[in-house]
Amino acid sequence: MQSSEPAVILPMNHPDSRIPSDASAPVETLHVGKWLSLRKRGRWEYAERNNPGGAVIILAVTPEDKVLFVEQYRVSILKHTIEMPAGLVGDLHEHGDEDAMLAAGRELEEETGYRCGRLEFVHEGPSSSGMSTEMIAFVRAWDLVKVGPGGGDESENIIVHEVPRTQAGEWLFARAAEGYSIDPKLFAGLWFIEHTGEKARS
């Protein structure tokens, strides 16, 4: 027996009309590594970090009005990169209960040697929504004080760069011309630096 109710046809601009038909398919696990897992939902394959906390990028400007960047070699792309201080939230057993704000303070000091007086959440979004479930939070660090050398943990070899805020964009393009890989999120980070805080809101 057919229903007498008419079929519901959603307009093309309705959000639900653009959701793929297999978006609610069961999730299959294709591979589990130490840090990453490969999943499949319907026809879609994507990576998922094994730590559930996501990642955090720290927007840090020194009292001398210099933006903190970090340089390190990334094996996945076989290049030296320029990034902002960043790290995973709750990636180690002893940090399992931390949130993005705690992770931001820890990673800032670990990578750059600076400790901050306070932290401000700015924004959160996907790092690469077409291939990963990872979400990244941007956190602004305030009232920085130098307390150590930085350089990262024993598995990292990080070089810290302190760049005058007004020259940061130009400096990044110069590093790109030298062959460094520049994380595009840095330019979003510089925009957030200019548009967050009391000075930006005044």
Put a short name on every predicted segment:
Residues 115-122:
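A short coil-to-beta-strand element that immediately follows conserved catalytic motifs
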Residues 22-64, 72:
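Acidic, metal-coordinating catalytic segment for phosphate/diphosphate chemistry
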Residues 39-40, 128-147:
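Active-site-adjacent beta-strand/loop module that shapes the phosphate/pyrophosphate-binding cleft
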Residues 38-40, 59, 69, 138-140, ...:
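Conserved hydrophobic/aromatic beta-strand scaffold that supports enzyme active sites
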Residues 7-13, 18-22, 80, 121, ...:
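Nudix hydrolase/Nudix homology domain
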Residues 29-34, 49, 75, 125-136:
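Acidic pyrophosphate-coordinating catalytic loop
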Residues 49-53, 57-62, 66-106, 147-148, ...:
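Conserved Nudix-box catalytic region and its N-terminal flanking loop in Nudix hydrolases
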